[in-house]
């Protein structure tokens, strides 16, 4: 309920959720609610996955399940589309790999799934213009994979008007039983566990020695912004070991 309310009042939303945290169920239900309550003519919504087949396997069954009880609902299996006759609204599952098929459409709202695997060019050049004439919303959902575009969106949303961001860690949501998390922690590398279940953007930097250290510093609020004093010389020297993770100078 909290997340639906936040996404109702903010146009652009970045939702970072641990694996098996229910983000797809949230996203599909939010689209259905938005579609059925839209007063505009012919509302259009899309759930966009990195690949169409991926969207079909992760979201299509949920879309059919949660909209099946709505009178007048029609399903198009070949186009992964649901049409609601009550107000001529539509929700479709789309793959980002076929970006040319998206161009030129309009949307009242979109969900971008697994945003960490989506190229920023897709939103900048295709999706964002599709939202303009209807002032549509966008919700970016996913799990961290290093400091890529998804991380940039998360940081941007902290300070931009009409943007919202939130992080749901497995240790906080309690969705996954504690004993299962303990078992996963034993089976996975510390970095992978932190990334997939604790939503760490640092852990995704494979082979890095500094990732866990910076993560700890950030959690302790020991990394701050300071005004630049141009009278003081500052030098930093780094060898990040991108090709050889055993070398530090």
Model-derived features: positions:
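Phosphate/NTP-binding elements of NTP-utilizing enzymes
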Residues: 1-246
């Amino acid at each position: 309920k909290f997340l639906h309310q936040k996404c109702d009042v903010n146009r652009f939303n970045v939702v970072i959720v641990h694996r098996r945290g229910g983000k797809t169920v949230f996203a599909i239900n939010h689209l259905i609610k938005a579609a059925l309550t839209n007063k505009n003519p012919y509302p259009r919504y899309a759930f966009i996955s990195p690949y169409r087949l991926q969207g079909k396997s992760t979201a299509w069954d949920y879309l059919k399940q949660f909209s099946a009880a709505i009178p007048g609902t029609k399903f198009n299996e070949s186009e992964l589309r649901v049409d609601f006759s009550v107000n001529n609204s539509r929700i479709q599952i789309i793959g980002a790999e076929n970006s040319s098929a998206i161009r030129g459409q309009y949307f009242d709202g979109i969900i971008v799934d697994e945003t960490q695997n989506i190229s920023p060019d897709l939103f900048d050049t295709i999706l964002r213009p599709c939202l303009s004439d209807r002032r549509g919303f966008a919700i970016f959902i996913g799990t961290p994979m290093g400091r890529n575009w998804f991380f940039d969106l998360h940081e941007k949303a902290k300070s931009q008007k009409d943007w919202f961001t939130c992080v749901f860690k497995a240790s906080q949501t309690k969705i996954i039983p504690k004993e299962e998390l303990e078992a996963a922690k034993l089976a996975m590398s510390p970095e992978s566990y932190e990334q997939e279940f604790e939503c760490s953007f640092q852990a995704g930097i494979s082979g890095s020695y500094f990732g866990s250290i910076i993560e700890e510093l950030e959690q302790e609020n020991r990394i701050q912004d300071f005004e630049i004093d141009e009278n003081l010389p500052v030098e930093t020297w780094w060898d990040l070991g991108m090709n050889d993770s055993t070398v530090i100078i």
